[in-house]
From Swiss-Prot:
Record's miscellaneous remark: Mitochondrial creatine kinase binds cardiolipin.
Tissue expr: Sarcomere-specific. Found only in heart and skeletal muscles.
Protein name as annotated: Creatine kinase S-type, mitochondrial
Gene name of this polypeptide: Ckmt2
Transit peptide among keywords: yes
InterPro entries, per the entry: ATP-guanido_PTrfase, ATP-guanido_PTrfase_AS, ATP-guanido_PTrfase_cat, ATP-guanido_PTrfase_N, ATP-guanido_PTrfase_N_sf, Gln_synth/guanido_kin_cat_dom
Residue numbers bearing the Phosphotyrosine modification: Y255
Family to which this protein belongs: Belongs to the ATP:guanido phosphotransferase family.
GO molecular function, one term: cardiolipin binding
């Protein structure tokens, strides 16, 4: 895996840095700083045994708390990634936030690509618990961005108000948001907007820096579901992802506002395709086309996305590993949402519901945000098809209830194939 330093010393950066600082000075300064951070942290830990540092998780209800044991903690506490990220930094957000009233949170984050390897003894069981039994030690993640395979992708627009597909991508060699320095965060922004400037046709657009927006402009974009919210979530702040806000954060979108990229929120980038109405097939086609083009432009400039065959695309939160994909709709289902079988129907269809404005919001006028619950172990095409088939089933149930007919709880979807 490429480290931040090795990436720094590639391509166009190398000659400038070597000329300015000299090879020896640059190398020595960087490595000594990393070594000092690691040595200081290790010496501090040696003062107390792991049992004295073990967090009190007795009242916690998140995946990390369920999987962490004193034995695992003792094994991993003094380990560090090459960038100096520790186990305690990984789990701090889950220690500070015991649980969530509506969803079971993960309770830990990665500070860099190497976190998933160095702390695999905890990450692997957390991933298996969160992702419906997917075992990263035994399984390989499939990928498929062929939108032509999608069927029945047009919803009844009397019920479905909008459609959206999003994912995240991380730039290899740079620390993830919980651990990145200001320089790394600014480099992510620079790499992304330089590449995005190469998009053409209906994907062409421009970048808007958060620091240059007025409060009114920011809030309007948030209210219209185009921009990420302000960093008020304790899950975000406790993980260190709100540091230096709004430095090097922003949104890029095409001129139609149907293809968007968030920069430096929870992940390096979030890639989004969205539009009003129920044409999920068109939304997914634009998503696939735009995502492939963004990756090509990134690679042309000497960078690449974090990926491996076990975990798929590497992102900050383990909940988004694999595809990182969430395909969702805003759907109005007043009768079905009040039916006691609603939650079981969603569970069997591998769907989850959120309020109209997302997590921690209420459903306004009986409009719910319905999306796939899985991210890894199934391809992008499979997940979008699951959402299409599932939402069509929900709409069919709503129509039956309107006519006074009974509805059935569907059988559970089969487990993803083991590969």
């Amino acid at each position: 895996m490429a480290s931040a330093f090795s990436k720094l010393l590639t391509g166009r950066n190398a000659s400038l840095l070597f000329t300015t600082l000299g090879t020896s000075a640059l190398t020595t300064g960087y490595l000594l700083n990393r070594q000092k951070v690691s040595a200081d942290a290790r010496e501090q830990h040696k003062l107390f045994p792991p049992s004295a540092d073990y967090p009190d998780l007795r009242k916690h209800n998140n995946c990390m708390a369920e999987c962490l044991t004193p034995t695992i903690y003792a094994k991993l506490r003094n380990k560090m990634t090459p960038s100096g990220y520790t186990l305690d930094q990984c789990i701090q957000t889950g220690v500070d936030n015991p649980g969530h009233p509506f969803i079971k949170t993960v309770g830990m984050v990665a500070g860099d690509e190497e976190s998933y390897e160095v702390f695999a003894d905890l990450f692997d069981p957390v991933i298996k618990l969160r992702h419906n039994g997917y075992d990263p030690r035994l399984m390989k993640h499939p990928a498929d961005l062929d939108a032509s395979k999608i069927t029945h992708g047009q919803f009844d627009e009397r019920y479905v108000l909008s459609s959206r597909v999003r994912t995240g991508r991380s730039i290899r060699g740079l620390s993830l948001p919980p651990a990145c320095s200001r320089a790394e965060r600014r480099e992510v922004e620079n790499v992304a907007i330089t590449a995005l400037g190469g998009l053409k046709g209906d994907l062409a657009g421009r970048y808007y820096k958060l620091s240059e927006m007025t409060e009114q402009d920011q809030q309007r974009l948030i209210d219209d579901h185009f921009l990420f919210d302000k960093p008020v979530s304790p899950l975000l702040t406790c993980a260190g992802m709100a540091r230096d806000w709004p430095d090097a954060r922003g949104i890029w979108h095409n001129y139609d506002k149907t293809f968007l990229i968030w920069i430096n929120e929870e992940d390096h980038t979030r890639v989004i395709s969205m539009e009003k109405g129920g044409n999920m097939k068109r939304v997914f086609e634009r998503f696939c086309r735009g995502l492939k083009e963004v990756e090509r432009l990134i690679q042309e400039r000497g960078w690449e996305f974090m990926w491996n065959e076990r975990l798929g695309y590497i992102l900050t939160c383990p909940s988004n590993l694999g595809t990182g994909l969430r395909a969702g709709v805003h759907v109005r289902i007043p009768k079905l949402s009040k039916d006691p079988r609603f939650s079981k129907i969603l569970e069997n269809l591998r769907l989850q519901k959120r309020g109209t404005g997302g997590v921690d919001t209420a459903a306004v006028a009986d409009v719910y945000d319905i999306s796939n619950i899985d991210r890894i172990g199934r391809s992008e095409v499979e997940l979008v098809q699951i959402v299409i088939d599932g939402v069509n089933y929900l709409v069919d149930c709503e129509k039956k209830l309107e006519r006074g007919q009974d509805i059935k709880v569907p059988p559970p979807l089969p487990q993803f194939g083991r590969k």
